[in-house]
Amino acid sequence: MSRRRRAVKREILPDPKFGDIVITRFMNALMYDGKKSVAEGIVYGALDVLKKRGGNQADPVRMFHEALDNVKPAVEVRSRRVGGATYQVPVEVRADRRQALAIRWIIDASRKRGEHTMEERLSNELLDAVHNRGSAVKKREDTHRMAEANKAFSHYRW
């Protein structure tokens, strides 16, 4: 067990445009070198593109949350050493980690895409995630497949 105290969760303020805390978390994860205004511009630009693509009555925040929900993993594998052998043990993912992983995977998948601007890449990745395709969704499927393949070791859970 850790001897240190549990770290206090910092309160994150909702973003100024939509009033959504998850979007702020997304911006913070996207940000490089403390350049929040750049990250803000990218996210808001991508959400504007989502609004245009989905028709004017489409709600970009709802689409964003739908994309995030489609990428969130339910289970993952963790390494566990038992008697000299290392087993990949499937474990259920906590809600806060689920969200963090989904955000990270969407950003990583966006950065690896081939479009010119980050705004385009992010909007296309979010759109793909809404339709259950794209690299981020594939990452979730692979994680679930690994957990399914190692289901036999689930009794080693901790």
From Swiss-Prot:
Keyword Iron: no
Record key words, sorted: Ribonucleoprotein, Ribosomal protein, RNA-binding, rRNA-binding, tRNA-binding
Superkingdom field: Bacteria
Gene3D superfamilies: Ribosomal protein S7 domain
Gene Ontology molecular function terms on file: rRNA binding; structural constituent of ribosome; tRNA binding
Biological processes annotated in GO: translation
Family: Belongs to the universal ribosomal protein uS7 family.
Quaternary structure, from the entry: Part of the 30S ribosomal subunit. Contacts proteins S9 and S11.
Alphabetized PANTHER family for the sequence: RIBOSOMAL PROTEIN S7
The protein's name: Small ribosomal subunit protein uS7
Species this chain originates from: Granulibacter bethesdensis (strain ATCC BAA-1260 / CGDNIH1)
